[in-house]
Amino acid sequence: MRQILIAVAVALTVSILLTPALIRLFTRQGFGHHTREDGPPTHHAKRGTPSMGGVAIIAGIWAGYLGTHLAGLAFDGEGISASGLLVLGLATVLGIVGFLDDLIKIRRSRNLGLNKTAKTIGQVAAAVLFGVLALGFRNANGLTPASADLSYVREIATVTLAPGLFVLFCVVVVSAWSNAVNFTDGLDGLAAGSMAMVTAAYVLITFWQYRNACVTAPGLGCYNVRDPLDLAIVAAATAGACIGFLWWNAAPAKIFMGDTGSLALGGIIAGISVTSRTEILAVVLGSLFVAEVSSVVLQILTFRTTGRRVFRMAPFHHHFELAGWAETTVIIRFWLLTAIACGLGVALFYGEWLAAIGA
């Protein structure tokens, strides 16, 4: 537990201290945000707000993770694992793709960065590399970071994917989550606050998997997850980094995370869900992100087939703004929905364990 607390504390401290330094640096360099011309009128006042704040989030996560393991040397904590590094590596590569996207937007003074093809190639490359490596690194107990079995709370043995299909599955999961968080990052603090809650839920889930691992506590309801404690540390560091960033990103935002942060955070959800064997449960925990990306897909499909729009504007948080809701009202209500979804997800996880032990 102390490793988790250290991860939160270090990540939060680094993020909350580094973010204002980035605000000053990006302001001097003119790295300002460019709003959508067709966006809500209230958003035009945000033009010029520093972007690429995701750098602070990624730095905070890495600092929390590495700092925890350095501190662990003093009290014989578990070392760095393949699962933890794979998740962080995936998030970092996606963060680099997002950084390039943000940089092009700034250089060209418009709200369009990398073209869709280049951005998709970056996401797919990161996902393929993650998927291939996740089925390797078998430990002494025969466990790999990921399982080819489709997973809800634990593997569904009746649905086993061939290696090639598993990699394709990872491409879908990574692309979906990175885009979902990216679309959600349209209001001050919405994505950061929601991510803090989702990763906090994952701290509870992965720590419970650690306490009930089949390797150390064999029996009914145990979990065959390779590195659950290290995943809990990654989740804790992410939650801490998001909270630290939220201090400056809360409305009215002093800085935005940009695609640098949103793509990286989407990678965190994708990576942890795959390595903790909870890909389906993640949809419940991250219901807000799922709803946001679904609203975009629905809007596009409906408009192309009928010429009409379902929402005033997509992602659908803008729909509520255009309906007259204040931005802060949308944010707080969406946070509440995320909290409910996370509570439901943790309850489903625990309920499955109770069922597994016959309670």
From Swiss-Prot:
One Gene Ontology biological process: cell wall organization
Keyword Zinc: no
Subcellular localization: Cell membrane
First-level EC class: transferase
Membrane topology of the entry: Multi-pass membrane protein
Pathway participation: Cell wall biogenesis; peptidoglycan biosynthesis
UniProt-listed CDD domains: GT_MraY (cd06852)
GO MF term list: metal ion binding; phospho-N-acetylmuramoyl-pentapeptide-transferase activity; UDP-N-acetylmuramoyl-L-alanyl-D-glutamyl-meso-2,6-diaminopimelyl-D-alanyl-D-alanine:undecaprenyl-phosphate transferase activity
Keyword vocabulary terms for this entry: Cell cycle, Cell division, Cell membrane, Cell shape, Cell wall biogenesis/degradation, Magnesium, Membrane, Metal-binding, Peptidoglycan synthesis, Transferase, Transmembrane, Transmembrane helix
Record Pfam families: Glycos_transf_4, MraY_sig1
Catalytic activity of the protein: UDP-N-acetyl-alpha-D-muramoyl-L-alanyl-gamma-D-glutamyl-meso-2,6-diaminopimeloyl-D-alanyl-D-alanine + di-trans,octa-cis-undecaprenyl phosphate = di-trans,octa-cis-undecaprenyl diphospho-N-acetyl-alpha-D-muramoyl-L-alanyl-D-glutamyl-meso-2,6-diaminopimeloyl-D-alanyl-D-alanine + UMP
Chief place of localization: membrane
Keyword Cell membrane: yes
Segments crossing the lipid bilayer: 3-23, 55-75, 80-100, 117-137, 156-176, 187-207, 231-251, 255-275, 280-300, 334-354
PROSITE patterns assigned: MRAY_1 (PS01347), MRAY_2 (PS01348)
Cofactor(s) listed in the protein's UniProt record: Mg(2+)
Enzyme Commission code(s) on record: 2.7.8.13
Domain of life assignment: Bacteria
GO CC list: plasma membrane
Known function: Catalyzes the initial step of the lipid cycle reactions in the biosynthesis of the cell wall peptidoglycan: transfers peptidoglycan precursor phospho-MurNAc-pentapeptide from UDP-MurNAc-pentapeptide onto the lipid carrier undecaprenyl phosphate, yielding undecaprenyl-pyrophosphoryl-MurNAc-pentapeptide, known as lipid I.
Family statement drawn from the similarity comment of this UniProt entry: Belongs to the glycosyltransferase 4 family. MraY subfamily.
Descriptive protein name: Phospho-N-acetylmuramoyl-pentapeptide-transferase
Native organism: Mycolicibacterium paratuberculosis (strain ATCC BAA-968 / K-10) (Mycobacterium paratuberculosis)
Originating gene: mraY
